[in-house]
Regions:
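Thiol-based oxidoreductase modules, predominantly thioredoxin-like and allied folds used
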Residues: 72-88
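Bacterial signal peptide processing site
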Residues: 20-22
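Extracytoplasmic/secreted envelope proteins and their assembly/folding machinery
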Residues: 57, 61, 65, 90, ...
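Bacterial N-terminal signal peptides that target proteins for export
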Residues: 1-8
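Non-catalytic, surface beta->alpha helical segment in thiol-disulfide oxidoreductase systems
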Residues: 105-143
Length: 143
């Protein structure tokens, strides 16, 4: 019985840990040499995802398809979902220092990490999540 209890505790801890990406609320202020490059919304995730992780992907996709549809059609924004646990994505994960659930906006040399905002709002305040994500993307598009 104790073994089962410890196994369940370990599994729960592992699941929660896999939902925590490298969280830095920062923007790299390097000069953007590719001002014409699109903003890429990267949502990185692991194999095991919690309800909040699933909500982040769902709400990011909704934002991309609804709130940013004109920008997507114009080619100024794109959205990619990346499984951080797959070997083929290792180089991209290392490039951005990602090992779990992480939401990044990238344009040229500039990176904005929205992971904290995503975990705070995707499930409980999806309207606020979509508004903040769309605003951040539009700021990057404008430069």
């Amino acid at each position: 019985m104790k073994t089962l209890r410890y196994l369940l505790l370990f599994t729960a801890s592992l699941t929660i840990a896999s939902c925590q990406g490298k969280v830095n609320s920062q923007a790299n202020d390097s000069s953007d040499k590719n001002s014409g490059s699109p903003v890429t919304i990267y949502y990185f995730h692991g194999e095991h995802r919690c309800p909040t992780c699933l909500a982040i992907e769902k709400e990011t996709k909704t934002t991309f398809e609804v709130n940013l549809s004109k920008e997507a059609e114009a080619g100024t924004v794109e959205f990619e979902v990346i499984n951080a646990d797959e070997a083929k994505n290792q180089a991209l994960c290392e490039k951005y220092g990602v090992y779990g659930s992480t939401l990044l906006l990238v344009k040229g040399n500039k990176t904005v990490n929205l992971t904290n905002m995503a975990f705070s709002n995707a499930r409980r305040n999806p309207d606020q999540f979509r508004e903040e994500l769309a605003n951040e993307v539009k700021k990057l598009i404008k430069g």
